[in-house]
Design a protein with these regions (language model features):
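Short acidic, hydrophobic short linear motifs in intrinsically disordered regions
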Residues: 73-85
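Short amphipathic alpha-helical interaction segments
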Residues: 87-102
Length: 156
């Protein structure tokens, strides 16, 4: 019977730590998280110079990060731009974008300046989830994907 109180105490400590980490992450300045997302995207693009982008592709995450940064900069993102951010063929990117829309992670709206163009943005819930996730990585001391020096990849 003494195991139950000890286990409950351990669970309580773990929960307290998770709450503290989440509060610390929430207290971070949004600009810091935007910079973190921007650096992550830059690191992923740099990696693509050395390895086949399809090999390490994560189109949904690339789209979400791109939209997250664009949202912080108040820049509209077209469907085409979001596809380009994914670093996969356009048809594949459109399928991923459709899935993200179906899951209500992104929202499509008509561009008021160009009625024939559709703008893509993060849903409020997804923006909050991306912020919380990036904040948790920062609170764990995990940096964004490294950006390598601007050296052309070796050929041959």
């Amino acid at each position: 019977m003494t195991q139950i109180p000890a286990r409950a105490e351990r669970i309580e400590r773990q929960m307290r730590k998770l709450i503290e980490d989440a509060e610390r992450a929430a207290a971070m300045h949004k600009g810091d998280l935007t910079d973190y997302a921007r650096q992550t995207l830059a690191g992923r693009k740099q990696r693509d110079r050395y390895f086949d982008p399809i090999l390490f592709s994560n189109p949904a995450w690339d789209i979400l990060l791109h939209l997250y940064v664009a949202d912080a900069e108040a820049k509209p993102v077209s469907v085409l731009d979001s596809c380009l951010a994914s670093t996969v063929p356009q048809g594949v990117a459109l399928r991923w974008l459709g899935y993200l829309k179906q899951e209500e992670m992104v929202i499509e709206i008509q561009d008021p300046a160009r009625p024939r163009q559709t703008i893509v943005r993060l849903s409020d819930q997804t923006r909050s989830a991306v912020s919380a996730y990036l904040g948790s990585l920062v609170s764990l001391g995990l940096g964004p994907e490294p950006v390598m020096p601007d050296i052309p990849p070796a050929r041959g």
